[in-house]
Amino acid sequence: MILILKYTGATIILLSVLIEIGQLFPNNDFGCEECKLKENNIFSKPGAPVYQCMGCCFSRAYPTPLRSEKTMLVPKNITSEATCCVAKEVKRVIVNDVKLMNHTDCHCSTCYYHKF
């Protein structure tokens, strides 16, 4: 009987500690904010701000479906996908004779590293 009480007490203490640790993490952003417009300090002028999309979006990994894996040149059993913070709408502006695209709205979408 005493042994059962000891195990029960130890289990309750362990669960309490784990719950406390788990509640610390949702309050942290881990250095990456959500995808939103931020002012670009390099190109912005007083009265003429230039905005760009900055922030983080999700990424995930999952097992590659067998049908897809059979068609790959180099089969991989894990498939990953990611989205990037990109401009939904832009407006062209000229700052110091430099043509810029001022972002007006952002969202998480497919990553295009090769596009400007």
Swiss-Prot record:
Assembly behavior: Heterodimer. Glycoprotein hormones are heterodimers composed of a common alpha chain described here and a unique beta chain which confers their biological specificity to the different hormones.
Entry keyword DNA-binding: no
Signal peptide (residue range): 1-24
PROSITE patterns found in the cross-reference section: GLYCO_HORMONE_ALPHA_1, GLYCO_HORMONE_ALPHA_2, GLYCO_HORMONE_ALPHA_3
Domain of life: Eukaryota
GO function term, MF aspect, one: protein heterodimerization activity
Function recorded in the entry: Shared alpha chain of heterodimeric glycoprotein hormones. These hormones bind specific receptors on target cells that in turn activate downstream signaling pathways. Involved in gametogenesis and steroidogenesis.
Keywords assigned: Disulfide bond, Glycoprotein, Hormone, Secreted, Signal
Gene Ontology biological process terms, A to Z: G protein-coupled receptor signaling pathway; positive regulation of steroid biosynthetic process; regulation of signaling receptor activity; thyroid hormone generation
Recorded family membership: Belongs to the glycoprotein hormones subunit alpha family.
Glycosylation sites: N77, N102
Chief localisation class: secreted
GO annotations of cellular component type: extracellular space; follicle-stimulating hormone complex
UniProt protein name: Glycoprotein hormones alpha chain
